[in-house]
Amino acid sequence: MTTSWSDRLQNAADLPANMDGHALKKYRREAYHRVFVNRSLAMEKIKCFGFDMDYTLAVYKSPEYESLGFDLTVERLVSIGYPQELLNFVYDPTFPTRGLVFDSTYGNLLKVDAYGNILVCAHGFNFMRGPEIREQYPNKFIQRDDTDRFYILNTLFNLPETYLLACLVDFFTNCDRYTSCEMGFKDGDLFMSFRSMFQDVRDAVDWVHYKGSLKEKTVENLPKYVVKDPKLPLLLSRMNEVGKVFLVTNSDYKYTHKIMTYLFDLPHGPKPGSSHRLWQTYFDLILVDARKPLFFGEGTVLRQVDTNTGKLKIGTYTGPLQHGIVYSGGSSDIVCDLLGAKGKDILYIGDHIFGDILKSKKRQGWRTFLVIPELAQELHVWTDKSSLFEELQSLDIFLAELYKHLDSSSNERPDISSIQRRIKKVTHDMDMCYGMMGSLFRSGSRQTLFASQVMRYADLYAASFINLLYYPFSYLFRAAHVLMPHESTVEHTHVDIHETESPMATRNRCSLDFKDSDFKRHQLTRSISEIKPPNLFPQKPQEITHCHDEDDDEEEEEEEEEEEEEEE
């Protein structure tokens, strides 16, 4: 009779160290069902689940939605005086990726790492090589904090804008009617800087979103532009069983109502056979016109929406939370008060790394779940093109072999040029599998700015929040060890540093016998006082204190409960 792991693990003596010497393989869900972890999070501690709407609950179809936004923005630019030829451009989803930086001085799109080092540089449709890049960026580096010059195109809404900027720069650089300059272009005596062009594009994008017909055309053909997932009601109803669920969106009520009605327009309720429910019934709190990221700071006045007309009722709402009421404005502090929750009780789920994730974490301490729809393709390439990744590893091995028996006394210079060329070729082929700008998360071995932001601010991330459906609400999302190079490339074998290293590299932190006279202060320099400190040396912790990665505050909770009991 075999014993299940769950039964064996009930006994501390049967923990992995004593599991009959068999190698254990960690169980993992299918890649397309996975939720990935940057910081450990215990789901049973989450009391409230918060959602953004656009690109989170409502996922817009790609490239249909981006094409619509692109076309409308081009039409707006032409209407204010830009050349008619621009109407011939068609959105190409293989070119842009999120997280690119636009240099408004030189008109370049830059893919950079977390420190501002340039990984890819494109001027229009022309991908610049190393020498060209160094002419404008001598160290292949930018000052990211120069926000007046560099604009980060971080959101999914930025994708059409990213491609449009490339189209415009390429057009004005190569069209015979215009004279190309380093910082813009000339039409006779008229000069247009890339900075002015960029501002025109920004203004046109804002006009399309807030005054134009983007939302109108979207709701006219929702099946074409919005993904409907029949599992959505089931997940929200299960969340309702273990906590509160709320919606915070920047969209107005009329648009929100049409989108949400479509998402929940199913022949059944949470489960097949159950009766249909209105979308409002799945949420304890609904808040529109949030104006994130301002919402996570001082916020705006909280008002009540008249759901019959979509207009706001007069006055500030000061009452308690009421089920079925739709609110406008407000702030994250107000949400916490209405829900009776504090920062870490809340898991907020959104797609906007700045407006949703960074601000909710830094200002409120909310736990964060970042939705990254591109992750599905990233995982596909990662698994489908594994041969390219394996070849890169093999090339690293060949490179190491060439230097294997050489040290500082060697005059031999191995010819590594062919290996370097092959590494560049394989890295390029690998990048092109993702699109013209390469992976969202890396360029070769270098992680992108976007990847560093995901790791820094998102506790959890996945291609879709629907993946939470495949985990119990008691689940502990435990972060994997993030290894530094000296940890990931060194085997777990004992090395005696006293015998193998120079005296300059032997600093250690092992215990010493401080009672030995050799470690007492020298009597000639200072006499030892007869009055000794209460604790002469620190004591090694006898209880578990170094457990910051487990999202485990049991002792704090017990202390709080004891204090509450004493007060009663």
From Swiss-Prot:
Binds 1 Mg(2+) ion per subunit. Residues 528-568 are annotated as: Disordered. One of its GO terms (biological process) is dGMP metabolic process. Its EC number is 3.1.3.5, 3.1.3.99, 2.7.1.77. IMP binds at D52, D54, R202, D206, K215, T249, N250, S251, K292. The active site is at D52 (nucleophile), D54 (proton donor). Signal peptide: none annotated. Mg(2+) binds at D52, D54, D351. It catalyses: a ribonucleoside 5'-phosphate + H2O = a ribonucleoside + phosphate; a 2'-deoxyribonucleoside + a ribonucleoside 5'-phosphate = a ribonucleoside + a 2'-deoxyribonucleoside 5'-phosphate; IMP + H2O = inosine + phosphate; GMP + H2O = guanosine + phosphate. Residues 550-568 have a biased composition (Acidic residues). InterPro entries: HAD-like_sf, HAD-SF_hydro_IG_5-nucl, HAD_sf, Pur_nucleotidase. One of its GO terms (molecular function) is ATP binding. Its cofactor is Mg(2+). GO terms for cellular component: cytosol. It is found in: Cytoplasm, Cytosol. CDD domains: HAD_cN-II (cd07522). Its main location: cytoplasm. Residues 548-568 are annotated as: Required for tetramer assembly. Keywords: Allosteric enzyme, ATP-binding, Cytoplasm, Hydrolase, Magnesium, Metal-binding, Nucleotide metabolism, Nucleotide-binding, Transferase. Homotetramer. PANTHER family: 5'-NUCLEOTIDASE DOMAIN-CONTAINING, CYTOSOLIC PURINE 5'-NUCLEOTIDASE. Broad specificity cytosolic 5'-nucleotidase that catalyzes the dephosphorylation of 6-hydroxypurine nucleoside 5'-monophosphates. In addition, possesses a phosphotransferase activity by which it can transfer a phosphate from a donor nucleoside monophosphate to an acceptor nucleoside, preferably inosine, deoxyinosine and guanosine. Has the highest activities for IMP and GMP followed by dIMP, dGMP and XMP. Could also catalyze the transfer of phosphates from pyrimidine monophosphates but with lower efficiency. Belongs to the 5'(3')-deoxyribonucleotidase family. This is Cytosolic purine 5'-nucleotidase.
